[in-house]
Amino acid sequence: MKRSRKFPIGRYTPVISVTILVLSLISIPAFAQQTNFIASLSGQVMSPTVSTTATGTAKFNIEPDGNMAYQIDTRNLYGVIGAHISLKNGTDLAQVFNSYMEINGKSEIPTGEVNGLLSKGVITSSDLSGPLAGKTVTDLANLMKNDSVYVVVRTQGHENGEIQGVITPSNTGYTQGL
């Protein structure tokens, strides 16, 4: 009769445990990177395209509290009236700049060129609109992970948008404290 050999599990348990631990730690940075997003903004991404020298960058980061910090920088942009995160079909999901809002008791309407910081702040669940109204910032981030949303910057000369860009996952984002 043949003897069966049993696999000596006890002997390999430490090796298996360390391997599982290492593999799980490798996946954590990949998940963490999904909390950072970026969009490169230009008139070429608009539909129809807009002939402009204006450009911009929008950076987003999911903060530990579950809210989303953002910063939008632009160059050669004149008379900005608003900026939104929108679905590809144009439905607005969150406002990230509104020149007609009252700030410190007065209406702020930018004049001249914007060369640098246009807007920075934090998006909370209560800021979401359209199909995301009543949902969470995580729902917005899930759309960003799928390249399903844009940042659109509207100006007095191009009320439907002068520059825009698709928001995509990134290795770097924006942290409110910076």
Describe these PLM feature segments.
Residues 2, 28-83, 87-178:
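Metal-centered catalytic cores of metalloenzymes
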Residues 2-18:
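Bacterial N-terminal signal peptides that target proteins for export
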Residues 15-27:
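Bacterial N-terminal signal peptides
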